[in-house]
Amino acid sequence: LVKEITPALPRLQEAFLIYEDQYDGEWDRGWYPFGEMFPHVDLTKYSRRDALKILLKRFAYRHVIFDADMAKSFYKLPMKDVQSAMEALLTEGVLTESQGGYMLKSDGEFLKTYFGEPPQSVYAMHRNDFLVKSNEHILKGKYPHAYPDTLYYLLIDGEWRGAAAGKFRYTPEVEDVILDLPP
């Protein structure tokens, strides 16, 4: 019975039907009906499309320029739903098209008057970082390797240019660094 119930619990949690009580230091965790734990939460306040519009506005605020594939990759939602919400935001004038993607209209107006140069930089971005998760659909196929894990993706001067592969045990054990540098 445990083998049948345990896989279903996270799915019920994602649907806001149950809540996992996580006390610090406790191994046993209780599962309770979501409505009993949070009676003030109104799960019908927003339609699915309205909720997606809110998510996409927040995503655009943090990402500045993005496309539907990035939002789908990050939120793990059906492309049809993402595109529908994006089209609604375009129609409402919240988003605007720019450089093959979308951005908040307010960001577009700010960038018209911004003339700064991006700084030269190298960042080792953890695979669970927001920028990595939203570009996962590209990065996974761009830097293949035979090692157990991709530990970090390398963001060099604002572009994805490599990955560090290996295994994370007590500390990261880097076995290989794959680079795609311009000549």
Please give the residue ranges for each predicted region.
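Long, charged, low-complexity, helical-prone intrinsically disordered regions
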Residues: L1-P183
